[in-house]
Amino acid sequence: MSDAATTIPSDEIDKLWNKARNQLVEAQVECEESLKILSKVRTEMDSSQKSRFKLKFILNCLVNQVEFFKNIMLEKCISTELIDNEWSKLVLVEIVNDVSYWQNEITTKMKILQGTKYDLTDDHSSLSDFICMDHVDILQQKIDEIPIIKQQVTNIRQHYKSIKDRIENQLVAVKLKKLRTYFDSHFSRDSKNNLFKLLESDYVTELNEFENELADFLRSITDHFDKCTILKEQQIPLPDLKELFQIVKKDDTQLENIRELVFETGLEVKAFSKKVNETISEIMDKIGGFHLLASKIVTELEKCEEYLSIFQKIANLVFVYKESCIKKIEQVQQLCEFYDKFKLGYKNLLRERDRRKATALQMEKILKECQEKLQALSDADLDQRQQFLLENGDYLPENIWPGYIDDMESMYSFEYSIHNVPN
């Protein structure tokens, strides 16, 4: 160790070591600052790149929402199911036809009852006197409401067409198309104006290069400091030590250049950070423009949803009309069935009247025949009594059969009445 000391001045070694240590500390501080800047830049770049996927997601959501509103809500639910099927076919055709049919039925039934003469008493002239004639108007109110319902459906068709045109000509053809074009122009991977390309490619390459350069600078300065430390400790053979000393002295001459490169790289990193931030700021401006266009579409969709309340109100109106018609039709059906049975019952009643009259006549005939037979028998009885008295009266005292022997009163009394059956 003493030989090495005589060969290599220790103060010179100390000078080299101290210089290497100072340069390493300063370089570490500068590189750490630059690396922090680069780390922040990378984070901001990653965050900005994620925003592109968010924008794509928002665009797809809006496209799907518009398509859903146009194809499902408007065309399928409102146009096909509600207007064409529920209203136009079921209500305006089937229900209206049923209402008209049953109105005609009950009117016909009423006329039949009016034309059916009542023959049992003089208090009424026809069977219609026994029913409420107001029933003929049960469905008339619904018939009177048909033009109103038809007009409402016509209005709603026009309203539907207006909304559909608004969706197709303004929302889809203008606003949504403008948003697509804006996205493709500024955020599509194939667009020349896509600033995300810088974040995804060029800037990433630059950032990696800066990180590699700083790592190389630190590696070189650290390696030089490690050599100085070995030289300072003087634990290797003298020939190796001398060789190391020459290497260290040579590297020392490059140390200032490396430090200058570290400093310049730090300036470049700051400039790079500024450039990236400016690009990100420009991207954020573009994103702001996207959100502005998207918000207009959202506002338009909200208006369209409000328009649906009009369909709901008309739907409720038509539903109430339909349900009311169904109930009235059921009521009229029951009345028509009752009127048929009422007329049939009246015909059967006339038959019953005739049957009772025939029965009364038959009873009267039987009773008259009976009366005639009884009278004949009574006459024969009187003749025989008189003959008995002529033959035996003079010989029999009256007290032998008191009250009967000379009694000439008929042995029967016959009274009857038959209930009158009116014509």
UniProtKB/Swiss-Prot annotation:
Location(s) in or outside the cell: Cytoplasm; Preautophagosomal structure membrane
UniProt keyword terms in alphabetical order: Autophagy, Cytoplasm, Membrane
Cellular compartments per GO CC: Atg1/ULK1 kinase complex; phagophore assembly site membrane
Chief site of localization: cytoplasm
Signal found in the keyword field: no
Any single biological process term in GO: autophagosome assembly
Protein name: Autophagy-related protein 17
UniProt KW Methyltransferase keyword: no
Pfam families tied to this protein: ATG17_like (PF04108)
Organism listed in the record: Kluyveromyces lactis (strain ATCC 8585 / CBS 2359 / DSM 70799 / NBRC 1267 / NRRL Y-1140 / WM37)
Membrane topology classification: Peripheral membrane protein
Free-text function comment from the UniProt entry: Autophagy-specific protein that functions in response to autophagy-inducing signals as a scaffold to recruit other ATG proteins to organize pre-autophagosomal structure (PAS) formation. Modulates the timing and magnitude of the autophagy response, such as the size of the sequestering vesicles. Plays particularly a role in pexophagy and nucleophagy.
One GO molecular-function entry: molecular adaptor activity
Similarity annotation: Belongs to the ATG17 family.
